[in-house]
Amino acid sequence: MERQVLLSEPEEAAALYRGLSRQPALSAACLGPEVTTQYGGQYRTVHTEWTQRDLERMENIRFCRQYLVFHDGDSVVFAGPAGNSVETRGELLSRESPSGTMKAVLRKAGGTGPGEEKQFLEVWEKNRKLKSFNLSALEKHGPVYEDDCFGCLSWSHSETHLLYVAEKKRPKAESFFQTKALDVSASDDEIARLKKPDQAIKGDQFVFYEDWGENMVSKSIPVLCVLDVESGNISVLEGVPENVSPGQAFWAPGDAGVVFVGWWHEPFRLGIRFCTNRRSALYYVDLIGGKCELLSDDSLAVSSPRLSPDQCRIVYLQYPSLIPHHQCSQLCLYDWYTKVTSVVVDVVPRQLGENFSGIYCSLLPLGCWSADSQRVVFDSAQRSRQDLFAVDTQVGTVTSLTAGGSGGSWKLLTIDQDLMVAQFSTPSLPPTLKVGFLPSAGKEQSVLWVSLEEAEPIPDIHWGIRVLQPPPEQENVQYAGLDFEAILLQPGSPPDKTQVPMVVMPHGGPHSSFVTAWMLFPAMLCKMGFAVLLVNYRGSTGFGQDSILSLPGNVGHQDVKDVQFAVEQVLQEEHFDASHVALMGGSHGGFISCHLIGQYPETYRACVARNPVINIASMLGSTDIPDWCVVEAGFPFSSDCLPDLSVWAEMLDKSPIRYIPQVKTPLLLMLGQEDRRVPFKQGMEYYRALKTRNVPVRLLLYPKSTHALSEVEVESDSFMNAVLWLRTHLGS
């Protein structure tokens, strides 16, 4: 019987990719001020920002669209778009002022060559640009941080000043042999200025500046900066402790100072992207005296402090352990006036029944407080879904706002005056934009959602969640009784299920998870006729802290066994073609995939690995997160000592490279040459070992790409090559 897979021509796959990749993704939303019409009606504008792949320009474009939401104070009466979308070129950050009358925009302009790109901070009011400041020309600091780790753009409550984070201005450096020609017609003062020894430091042009790792290259020493909107004067704040790097800052009550998160950078910086375990604390620096005050425990890790509307309390996430790299967090509350800190929501060791399984988001939304400053709203993974929750900060109760829905996943974009803006999607439904009012306390489950922007469901994609219990011989002795889940996508109504091939995708991390949200690659594969199995093995987030802690020391074993067990169970229950199973994984998902083709070579006909971890031992000295190597191998990390021989041996023993002699599955490797997280030499090590043994292997090396391989040109090329690899080795 002919196999029911849409792989007969590469052009068909390219056309399908071109169509599905046009689905835009929501990146941000903000709410305008309340407006009352002459007839007494009330409405607010919703400003949304989106991104979309542009295959003609080979870049991600950003655009905005506005909507009007008419309401009666408790529910939405009418909502709809206000005009078409507009591309926003060059915008790095933007923020509405507290009153909504002004908007600050950080914009890049100029060329793309070194030193050609400039940054401008603009202030807009109504229908005009009120101010524009050339930050690059002012030379008060280096480039402004626009990332979500350190970056911020915060209006003072008085709307007279703007707070942001930028790279500290570096001293000029020149060669020992640099000479300057003196103008004989210059004045004595000008000649003296040119001769000043402090104009440039000789011999420092090649001094190494340590940065914050993957996706944070050139970000080394952040400083807090304040712009006086009226005068244009920029001040770099003093008083920040020298041993920490500041970020995520906002104005304290009364504008008397600034609250910020400070990350320790001694004795050296570790990669911070996707690592919520970096030692950090909450600080307050007084603008008048320059005194800096510690507001939280300084031995833990914190993130995303958010000031309540009444300016009395600060809520933030706190991670009670510096290992592993991501985990269940506490929700903490700091009272500004009593100086008392309390834990509102604690770490959840294990989910009981359908109860709350803990907080796993890495950042709280910028707008997360209810109007009465009593409740906090956020989204978090709960097993294989992502739901919205409201927490009563007085009593600590957690209530789901989206439980009992259709099984998809939610993301909160913002909440203001109890009006929530959220995103909803499923594996077969691209993101839709919704608004709804937060009900009064005790009635949170009765949110009435109204769609602002609907998306068309993608036909012929069926999906569901499978709960899996490891067999007794695979139980974790210390953390017994843990289950895990997998999300299964399959083509709608195939003529013969036994002819359907399956692609298995373990996630990276390892402490992350798949949720039932829109994902381009799985949807593409499913539309081509593949069943796609997304496995949340033990160690994934969303299943309780015990599940996360069960994996360090057991990588290469527990995670691999879980994925293999999931594959065998699904093949047995669904009767897919067991002779046509392939693997596709990136980072730790690539680590698991390469383990599987070594430990279970008879199961898999093809494998695609993106920036995989191959040899934990050899990665230790080159990655931006050496602590990951040690901790996941099962040992405590210390920055002041090297592992002993037994630790090196254990790291090697838990690595896919150990199983090279058994590998016979054809492998496609995709590596980013600028990857700081899993340096591309990891994949090269595996490539050479397979070539030596005549195993079919192909290597794609993307020169300017990083760990995620997410650049539009790279992403599209890697997908098409993956499809062709599957076509070649699974057969069409």
From Swiss-Prot:
GO terms for biological process: amyloid-beta metabolic process; proteolysis; translational termination. Its main location: cytoplasm. Keywords: Acetylation, Cytoplasm, Hydrolase, Phosphoprotein. Signal peptide: none annotated. The modification N-acetylmethionine is found at M1. Homotetramer. This enzyme catalyzes the hydrolysis of the N-terminal peptide bond of an N-acetylated peptide to generate an N-acetylated amino acid and a peptide with a free N-terminus. It preferentially cleaves off Ac-Ala, Ac-Met and Ac-Ser. Also, involved in the degradation of oxidized and glycated proteins. This is Acylamino-acid-releasing enzyme.
